[in-house]
Amino acid sequence: MDSVYIYQWLYANYEVRGYGIALNNTVVCVRVPNFKQVVYVECTDPQHDPRSTFTQHGFRVYETPRACSLYGAKGVGTYFAARVPNYNAMRDVQETQGPFKIHESRVSKTMEFTARAGLPTVGWIQVSQRCVVTRTVTMAAKEYMVPNWRTDVRPAPDIEGVPPAKIVYFDIEVKSDHENVFPSDRDDEVIFQIGLVLCSGTTVLRTDLLSLPGRDYDASVYQYATEGELLHAFIAYIREHEVVAVCGYNIMGFDIPYIIKRCARTSMLGTFKRIGWDSHRLAIEKTAGVGHAKMTYIQWEGVLTIDLMPIIMMDHKLDSYSLDYVANHFVKAGKDPIRPRDIFHAYNTGLMARVGRYCVKDTQLCKQLVDYLNTWVALCEMAGVCNTSIMQLFTQGQQVRVFAQIYRDCTPMDVVDKVYVIPDGGCDSDVVSPSSYTGAYVYEPVPGVYKNVIPMDFQSLYPSIIISKNICYSTLVDQGGEEYAWQEHEGCEHDPQYAKQHALGVEIGVLQCNMAALPRRATQERARMRERISEMKIQYASMTPSVVKCNVFSFRFTHAHEGVLPRVLRNLLESRARVRARIKTTDDPDIRAVLDKKQLAYKISANSVYGTMGTQRGYLPFMAGAMTTTYCGRKLIEKAAHLLKTVVGATIVYGDTDSCYIQLGHDRASLDELWQMAVNASDTVSAFFERPVRLEFEQCIYTKFIIFTKKRYVYRAFTRDGKQRTGSKGVMLSRRDSAMCARNTYAAIMSAILEGSADVPFIAVRMMHDMMIPGALQDDDFVLTKSVQDIGNGDDNNHGSYKVRNPQKAQAAATQRVAPDDAEGYAIALRQEMVKQMPAQAQLAERMRLQGRAVVSGARIEYVVLKHQYGVPEGALGARLLDFERWRDMKVAYPLDRLYYMKSVVNACDQLLVTAGYGPVCSKVYAAHLQLAYVHKQLMRRMMPTV
């Protein structure tokens, strides 16, 4: 048997092909001919048998006596399997209005094949040597024709590691007609440079630059007379070096779509789509969307497209996702300081060497990021664990990963052994799907400073609940089993808060009547009552829930058989435990890196199951399971808090979702004593729960713990090895829409308080003053970032993803601005008025769009807040935003609104200072600067000449 590491499966012309890397690092192709899809047919009318309908269309029918729907495990005996002869037969049957429903018809052929054959979607397999063929159809070094996939191919779980892949990193540079306008595929907006870095694993094999003719190049640059020749050389480069993947940054958002457009202009699109290992097959152009971003790629045979931008966006929360910011964040290296206008000017003048170095450096940064983040290994291990393809990980959402694992567990090798059929329509109609339900339990904290707080949390709480309670689609029953019943009341007459709010409303009404009855001269009393009523109205509004709930729920789950979800989760958690144990005994750094990515993949995959169940739409929604899991989680945390107080004698400081923060022992207990008490408390409380539920000690003690409200606290932690670290949750440091100067101010004050510094007020005042002094901080410290959704680019009648608060107001304003018969002018005016009602960052994005600059939907834009003409925080915020790149070029003419930045940090810092006992220092500093600004405003108005 030959060992092959499969990195791609695909289906074409009733043949499954798997491309992989052999032990000698060559690419091989495994071909499985005549694999036919199998669907499962549900008989909806017992008086009519639809089997004859399928046999007449060429289907081969199999009896599946144990098959039933995954939802509720109902309908045993009403299903049969049918093997699809061809696409046309499947289409004809689907158009037949018969007494049947077809299920599992939307599952991809490769997912079905790997599930039935028990093969990994990405990973090591073994292929019989007798399957090697000499007459090949691909350019692979070796081809295997597998006539019997049941015996001639099998998984190879004993082989470890991920072989190095030959990857080419690339980046393109494009000319634009206007220096400040983003390229839009006009006739002369050509691709004039392509930077290439060819690597095998972490080893760089060669670095090249392909370019149109330039006047200052040396002999190492490959130059071509036309854009068509340049693109042909790029295609030939990928083919010649036999790569398994092309990689870049945002290549699915810009580079590949633009190359497709230029190839279409130069009549080379067919050649571009034949880059794969089978040059006779025309690859399919596909589009995908994650969040608000649209991605375009070509599904080449044996050549993957890896875009680092969506991968990093899904795995890391950063302030910005520009390549320059990401590279500086991870590898401490940035792009060359070249602006788009410099790129366009270089093409127009022919002096392109500097831009060429910039282009190549971008590709090198992508290579460094892949090496640093171990992206290739991470993608391979995650895809193998989730039973998906590599590209599905970042072109589709989380749900496909869970669906693939459930489908694999429900798919036997022999179709007659089928038990659970996954319905194409998702959830059955008799399963309750409410629009919202109560979330996790929260033990309300008392704000303050606490010492020696011990954090305890449930290990994999929701997966453990699903396993211990056997919560699954297939175990939900109407009668019998274990019942989970509860009520949810919020904002209704059964809610105690409702009675308090009602009483408060009555009191407000009485006060208003009393105030109306006061004599006119009682101005002071009326003012006091008005202030009191205003405070009570604010309190009344805060007590009003966003959603009114008045529900009674009851679900039953049987323990007669193990459900699919518990079995899948048990395998994931047990596999992760085995991998983590092996990491401790492995000395090989390469194997350790692979195992670490694998255990992380198991963890992420297990945690994704609960979120997938709780969706309204998707592959397998299961609100009953999600609600029951959440309910059990609430009961567990309540039980844990009760046990910690009664059995262990702990004091509960705070509890939330899956964590408890407690105090043990006496005030003078040493850290070693507290450590041992925490371990004993974990063992004692865990003994009261069903396995695998366990309350774990987090292996650290918070020597100082400052909590403000639920989900918002800061701490200083002590670990067993004597190290100390500070941390936080839910405060300004966690918010990406805060400027770095604000976060640095908060971090400095937080560290000073946690470390017990005597200079806390001085540090707060100094940090606040630094924000007001020009030159004291770096320009980057004032950058704000926010994500921008679709703003309806290019269409004045389309407002994208944003909702306009008052369209009637916008229509009225637009009508006043233009003549009644000017339809085009009205559309433009209406667009402008609508944009005024969008968030400030969307207004900035609209201005950038009108200037011809690219605004990627879903990306985070960097901007600064400009100073008002009088220096006071007045005027609409949307009109005072400017993107950071443009501001940096003209910052002398556009001073910053430093009061805005100072105000943004006042409330958060003062909450920290007041809770720690220092008083509202920051608000006093801000008030002084604000008063100074208003004095300056009055002076400017008096000194400004009148016209």
Swiss-Prot record:
GO BP field: base-excision repair, gap-filling; DNA replication proofreading; nucleotide-excision repair, DNA gap filling; viral DNA genome replication
Catalyzed reactions: DNA(n) + a 2'-deoxyribonucleoside 5'-triphosphate = DNA(n+1) + diphosphate
A Pfam family annotated for this UniProt entry: DNA_pol_B_exo1
Top-rank lineage group of the source organism: Viruses
SMART domains referenced in this protein's UniProt entry, alphabetically: POLBc (SM00486)
Keywords recorded for this protein, A-Z: DNA replication, DNA-binding, DNA-directed DNA polymerase, Nucleotidyltransferase, Transferase, Viral DNA replication
Stretches that traverse the bilayer: none
Similarity annotation: Belongs to the DNA polymerase type-B family.
EC number(s) reported in the record: 2.7.7.7
EC class name: transferase
UniProt protein name: DNA polymerase
GO molecular function, one term: 3'-5'-DNA exonuclease activity
